[in-house]
């Protein structure tokens, strides 16, 4: 699969853009375990043109994580165009437009998935951004606003006509948020549409290597995107790659090995930011990791993780888990 001149190989697997998750440390970790392309946290166009410090930091990328896409969202054409210019100066490989975020503070204001209620404006913004920058522009969106308005098949053609070079589809409507099951049949319908010639990337409910391969085989997508399943589990890319290449599950990764991966993520986050900001960011990853699923009475330990303020505190909690439960996980 290629996006313009970016060769992403066969069966590429992408790390989805996730707010407060896909910081540089996590992106590099996922890249290490096999992610073929990574995305930044989504970036507000309004905040970008106002040069808000925290937002500007989201544009920080490094060569080790390439190819990397920076994703922006907004609801005004002029603002999105100016934001696109700023993003291009950060030298990402791709600029991605978010037309899929379902949360109220974004979609409720007409941005993200809110654009699914204003297709003319969505297309206007897309054309304007494509015409503004020289790097490839891609889009991430959903099936439609609700079950009665699943418009993705026609919308995909319209977005392609605007000049985008790849389309990512999350297999839910905005109304579903993250409930119910992703409808991959509609993603497959877009891919099999003879009028579509850009790469189609599927996203939604890919939590196992078996499901990843099934999505390639059954629906013919050019790539898959992993979101929430990578949260606290960056090695999922390694597991999927191994299964696709061999048809066999990766030999079980030891609890100790996986715990050390999380330790390294803590150190990487602190080194890239500072201890206060790094811990604030990474402690949520640890608390949500499926590595700790099944540990009895884990609620209090999770709360302690979420309250930790130093590397020493977090490592002390991980040492406690290892000493008390490591042999049983």
Per-region residue spans from a language model:
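Aromatic- and acidic-residue-enriched carbohydrate-binding clefts of CAZyme catalytic domains
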Residues: 116
């Amino acid at each position: 699969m290629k996006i313009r001149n970016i060769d992403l190989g066969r069966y590429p697997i992408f790390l989805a853009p996730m707010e407060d998750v896909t910081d540089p440390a996590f992106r590099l970790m996922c890249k290490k375990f096999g992610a073929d392309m990574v995305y930044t946290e989504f970036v507000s166009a309004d905040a970008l043109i106002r040069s808000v410090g925290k937002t500007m930091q989201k544009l920080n990328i490094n060569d080790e994580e390439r190819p990397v896409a920076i994703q922006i969202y907004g609801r005004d054409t002029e603002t999105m165009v100016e934001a696109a210019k700023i993003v291009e100066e950060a030298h990402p490989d791709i600029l991605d437009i978010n037309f899929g975020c379902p949360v109220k503070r974004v979609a409720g204001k007409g941005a993200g998935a809110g654009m699914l209620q204003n297709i003319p404006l969505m297309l206007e913004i897309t054309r304007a951004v494509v015409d503004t920058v020289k790097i490839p522009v891609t889009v991430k969106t959903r099936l439609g606003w609700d079950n009665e308005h699943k418009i993705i098949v026609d919308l995909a053609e319209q977005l392609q006509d605007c000049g985008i070079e790849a389309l990512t589809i999350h297999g839910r409507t905005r109304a579903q948020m993250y409930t119910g099951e992703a409808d991959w049949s509609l993603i497959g319908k877009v891919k099999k549409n003879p009028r579509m010639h850009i790469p189609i990337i599927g996203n939604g409910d890919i939590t196992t290597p078996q499901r990843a391969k099934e999505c390639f085989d059954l629906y013919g997508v050019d790539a898959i995107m992993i979101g929430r399943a990578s949260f606290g589990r960056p090695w999922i890319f390694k597991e999927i790659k191994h299964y696709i290449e061999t048809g066999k599950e990766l030999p079980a990764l030891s609890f100790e090995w996986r715990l050390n991966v999380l330790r390294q993520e803590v150190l990487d986050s602190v080194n890239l930011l500072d201890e206060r900001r790094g811990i604030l960011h990474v402690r949520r990853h640890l608390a949500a990791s499926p590595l700790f699923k099944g540990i009895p009475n884990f609620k209090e330990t999770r709360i302690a993780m979420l309250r930790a303020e130093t590397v020493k505190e977090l490592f002390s909690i991980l040492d406690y888990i290892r000493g008390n439960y490591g042999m049983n996980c």
